[in-house]
């Protein structure tokens, strides 16, 4: 790796502080089993003082196509790629990659409402995900590891009389392409100070399904490093990239790689409601 790129590692993987395009270029081709990409969406979000907004849509898409090409180079011939972006830009992603890889699923991550919703049109309640593979005849998909309850609407077990002898219908199934996972909220244990943090449960499904223990999982826009965290918990190896120093520090702490950075002790931010509870306990502690 280039010496100008800041990196930290442990026995499970490595995270890099710097520009994703530059760092991706230095990762060996066909060396990664699974890539999950959750890039800036070009919708004006504030990421630690850095605005998620390009001058034009064309500039944003041209930038996206660069890292998509690099990711396609880095993933193994039997590897998988999951791509996220906003609803308005996903059609461009879909058209761009469909003649380069096989799109197996167009996933809808559906979530509950929070805050103020649109009043003059139908507000967006989902984020799209493309599940792509290089070789549709040779890729990892561990269906048994991601089974969910097969809801029949019946209180009694349904019997399949087509079989001899008749047998109960299976109570579990592989999830469809509509995924219901709650967004990460402030009071959740997993919450970190980031405007678009993805839930652990979402990444668990992806990592379990499309990689095996010991495989390499890459996230070029790591944010709070949830992908790397899940990969480590599931005995995969990880590569994380993040350009924002504030979020890079979250990765160092969350992955147990470092407890200090540039002389600063890395600790979880105490939430306002936790401070209030602590003060109340102190107030009523007469012992």
Question: What do the PLM-derived regions correspond to, one by one?
Answer:
Residues 2-249, 283-287:
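Core catalytic lobe of class I
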Residues 249-287:
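PRPP-dependent phosphoribosyltransferase catalytic core
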